[in-house]
A protein has these predicted regions:
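Short mixed-charge
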Residues: 185-205
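N-terminal Rossmann-like NAD(P)+-binding domain of SDR-like oxidoreductases, especially those catalyzing
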Residues: 1-162, 167, 180-185, 192
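Helical cap/lid subdomains and adjacent loops of hydrolase enzymes that gate the active-site channel
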Residues: 176-178
């Protein structure tokens, strides 16, 4: 949404083919003249290559991931394929078809795992404690290797808590904020009724 404020910027959103696609988080800008959905899947090398080859992006921002830490224990191979191999596929496609493209990969504080000190910095050792954390560590090192080996503009940002109205309601912090909003609405609704009743039962003069 922020990028679309620039009339010179065209934004492509990569999405997997699905019988029941969910457009809830893109409804505010899906119809923007400078935005377009394209099909692609981080687990499919050919589709990622086609995206880079056909679009020729100046920037490639990868926020896609299987991001449920608990679920990563149930399907570790899939999590590694999406979060680590998916980044590798992006880097390979950029190297082949648009080496001047600037690539950003989203990391996670889960990379640090069992922490030695807080707050962590880039010098803190990475000791992940879940397949999810390990997959993000792998992506981190792949980005570094490709940047140094092929002179690509590739960076990996380690993200900590990040929130927004479009964050899934299955996350703990979203449950908390929704609960706060519900309580506020209930209190506000009660206060409105009290004010209404007070006004209804009061004498008033017209001025």
């Amino acid at each position: 949404e922020y990028l679309l404020r620039d009339p010179q910027c065209r934004v492509f959103g990569m999405m997997r083919r699905s019988a029941n696609p969910n457009f809830q988080n893109t409804k505010n800008f899906a119809d923007h003249e400078n935005f377009k959905f394209i099909f692609g899947d981080l687990t499919d090398t050919i589709s990622v290559e086609n995206v880079v080859k056909n679009i020729q992006p100046d920037y490639f921002i990868n926020f896609a991931a299987n991001s449920f830490v608990g679920c990563s224990w149930d399907m570790p191979l899939h999590v590694m394929d999406v979060n680590a191999n998916g980044v590798l596929r992006c880097l390979e496609a950029i190297k082949k078809f648009k080496p001047e493209c600037r690539f950003y990969s989203a990391g996670s504080s889960e990379q640090f795992g069992d922490v030695d000190y807080s707050p962590q910095d880039i010098k803190h050792p990475m000791k992940p404690r879940s397949p999810y954390g390990a997959s993000k560590c792998a992506a981190h090192h792949l980005v570094k290797v490709y940047r140094e080996s092929y002179d690509l503009y590739a960076v990996h940002g380690i993200l900590f808590n990040h929130e927004g109205t479009k964050r899934g309601e299955e996350f703990v912090t979203r449950k908390i904020t929704k609960g706060v909003a519900r309580i506020f609405n209930e209190i506000f609704s009660t206060q409105k009724k009290r004010i209404y009743n007070a006004l209804k039962n009061s004498d008033a003069d017209s001025v």
